[in-house]
Amino acid sequence: MPLKKRSASAPRKTPQEVPRLLISGGVEVLGLKTGPDSITEVEAFLNPRMGLENTDNHYGYSENVTVAKKKDDDKPLKNQLPCYSVAKIELPMLNEDLTNDTILMWECISVKTEVVGINTLVNTHSYGKRDGESPSMPIVGLNYHFFAVGGEPIEMQYIVQNFQCDYPVGVVAMKPSPLSTQVLDPKQKSKLTGDGIFPIECWAPDPSKNENARYFATYTGGLNTPPVLNITNTVTTILLNENGVGPLCKGDQLHIAAADICGFHIEEDNKYKYRGLPRYFKLVLRKRVVKNPYPVSTLLNTLFTQMSPNVQGQDMTKQVEEVKIYEGTEKLPGDPDMIRFRNQFGQEETVIPVITN
């Protein structure tokens, strides 16, 4: 039987073109670094910062929540304010020479994360509020779950329920807060740079920024809402954006943040404490070739600036009267009273004396 010739197939369509990403997170992206050592994994956990220190028997809880009697007399204590947990992870250094046109940067591409300790919420025999001979009340109430991964500190927006609230010393809050902080005031922003000092009720991730970070959050309200939590080690959250680029770790540093309020623990006297749980992270990073974002002049200036200790002293910008620097020798000037000096730009200037009658 003679073989049939293949019919000429229709020409294939050209693949659809997509925008070529040039800059992400303030860094010009070039390509990926392949090889057996181009992927690394990092495991970390963040403990909750509910208010009480790790030396207190109620570590992981807040102090009993008190309620203001008037709107303009709202003064919560620091140990009653759950705050964000923050950490900075130092990654292996990738570049020995930072003067090249291109360098390597770590790019975080995925994360596995879960709240650790939801099993503790089934405890109904420890001391707490109870009705007659019934078990003590389990943890109930509002739930707030948040985590973030970034190549630099997470950008936050300040927004509050009561602008007249007088927040205590030791937390990051606006003093005094303008009325505009009860809605979105684009002037009130900050970076999440401290552990246990940014109150959750005051700071939210800034949706207009955070191009070099990824954040996720859920909230369920109510005083008696039963917490609903899931855990698994089979779910991976991809951190790549629509252009296939994840957070780029500037300075070989990875920033993570978390906040996990699981409800209230109700005391026998009807006092309420916030209950928080820790969060586990497993992060996967790969090497990305990028255009060098660090000018050599900036690197050298930073090097010499950091070599000297940081001294907080009196302002000397208008106090230095005269600085003399000698170099080599010269012929004796004919006018010893003539003032010669170099200005702040290194240029030589001569002040010709003016004779007044």
Swiss-Prot record:
Modified residues (Phosphothreonine): 329
Primary subcellular site in the record, as a coarse category: virion
One GO-annotated biological process of the protein: virion attachment to host cell
InterPro entries for the chain: Capsid_VP1_Polyomavir, dsDNA_vir_gr_I_capsid, Polyomavir_VP1_sf
Region (C-terminal arm): 296-357
One CC-aspect GO term: T=7 icosahedral viral capsid
Sequence motif Bipartite nuclear localization signal, location on chain: 4-13
Cellular location(s): Virion; Host nucleus
GO MF term (any one): structural molecule activity
Keywords carried by this UniProt record: Capsid protein, Disulfide bond, Host nucleus, Host-virus interaction, Late protein, Phosphoprotein, T=7 icosahedral capsid protein, Viral attachment to host cell, Viral penetration into host cytoplasm, Virion, Virus endocytosis by host, Virus entry into host cell
Function: Forms an icosahedral capsid with a T=7 symmetry and a 40 nm diameter. The capsid is composed of 72 pentamers linked to each other by disulfide bonds and associated with VP2 or VP3 proteins. Interacts with sialic acids on the cell surface to provide virion attachment to target cell. Once attached, the virion is internalized by endocytosis and traffics to the endoplasmic reticulum. Inside the endoplasmic reticulum, the protein folding machinery isomerizes VP1 interpentamer disulfide bonds, thereby triggering initial uncoating.
Subunit note: Homomultimer; disulfide-linked. The virus capsid is composed of 72 icosahedral units, each one composed of five disulfide-linked copies of VP1. Interacts with minor capsid proteins VP2 and VP3.
Family per record: Belongs to the polyomaviruses coat protein VP1 family.
Domain writeup: A DNA-binding domain overlapping a bipartite nuclear localization signal is present in the N-terminal region of the protein and is required for efficient virus formation.
UniProt-recorded name of the protein: Major capsid protein VP1
Gene: VP1
